[in-house]
Structures are given as C-alpha cells and as structure tokens.
Amino acid sequence: MQYVTPDLCDAYPDLVQVVEPLFSNFGGRDSFGGEIVTIKCFEDNSLVKDQVDVDGTGKVMVVDGGGSLRRALLGDMLAEKAARNGWEGLIIYGCVRDVDVLAQTELGVQALASHPMKTDKRGIGDLNVPVTFCGVTFRPGEYVYADNNGIIVSPEPLSMPQ
C-alpha cells in the first residue's frame, strides 16, 4: 500500500501526530505503514534480531535506540529477514548500516543516520512498551505511516483519501 503522509494529515488533522523531521529513508520502500510493535533498547539489537524472525505482516517495528549515533541497530541480514517475514518496515531512533543493501530490500526503513559499527548482543531491552521520541509517543497496537515527507502516528488505522 502506498501512503502519502501529507494527504493523511489533510484528511485526519485531529487524529494524527507528526514526528519531528529528523529521519531519512534507507529502505527499498519509500512509503510504508501498519500496526506498531515497539522495542526499547540502547546499543543492543538483541530484541530486533528476535522480532525480525516473527511474522510481521501488517506491522511496523518502532525501535527506540535512545537516538544513539554510535552503533547500528539494523543491518542487511536483519532487514532481509524482516522483509521475508512480512514486516512493512522499521523506524529506528538510532542508526542503520549496510545502507546500499537496505536500499535494495523490499522493506521500509527510516532512521537517523548510518553507522558502520554493529551493536553488542547482551539481551537487554523491552518489547511492546510505549516509547517516546521526537515529540510523539508510540504505543503498541496504534498505527504509524511513513514516507519521504515524514512520519505520522494515529491511534487507529487510516485509509488514503479518495
């Protein structure tokens, strides 16, 4: 499904929250959206690795990496697994790596920046808890939509206006 966030904002101005414009597109899909699944972690992508193995059909993984610019929370191997398992996309409040491969992967990926260093795997983090960054709280079970214009959050699913 192709989402256009300006059109969604125009159609649902009282329903959506707009995330501060700090993110860039790194994935092969410029537009994506779905039900929110959250991960809160810091320089440890163990839970991201676990979740990409789960069926993500219709879902977007929102990863609160604390805004760290020192390690990448997603790379090519995890992105390819996420795409194979039906994830619509990932929004990473942190960094990604292997960006040339990510751009070829059928997956939406938005993040703050790229960084070549991988994370440690210490098994530390929280799954499906509300996370807040860039002026918005992301709650599991709510909905997020992203494109080259930005990222928006809604408490309910949105349809593109006709």
Swiss-Prot record:
Homotrimer. It comes from the Bacteria. One of its GO terms (molecular function) is metal ion binding. Keywords: Lyase, Metal-binding. This is Putative 4-hydroxy-4-methyl-2-oxoglutarate aldolase. GO terms for biological process: regulation of RNA metabolic process. The lineage of its organism: Bacteria, Pseudomonadati, Pseudomonadota, Gammaproteobacteria, Pseudomonadales. It is an enzyme of class 4 (lyase). It comes from Stutzerimonas stutzeri (strain A1501). Catalyzes the aldol cleavage of 4-hydroxy-4-methyl-2-oxoglutarate (HMG) into 2 molecules of pyruvate. Also contains a secondary oxaloacetate (OAA) decarboxylase activity due to the common pyruvate enolate transition state formed following C-C bond cleavage in the retro-aldol and decarboxylation reactions. Divalent metal cation. Substrate binds at residues 75-78, 97. A divalent metal cation binds at residue 98. Its EC number is 4.1.3.17, 4.1.1.112. Belongs to the class II aldolase/RraA-like family. The keyword S-adenosyl-L-methionine does not apply.
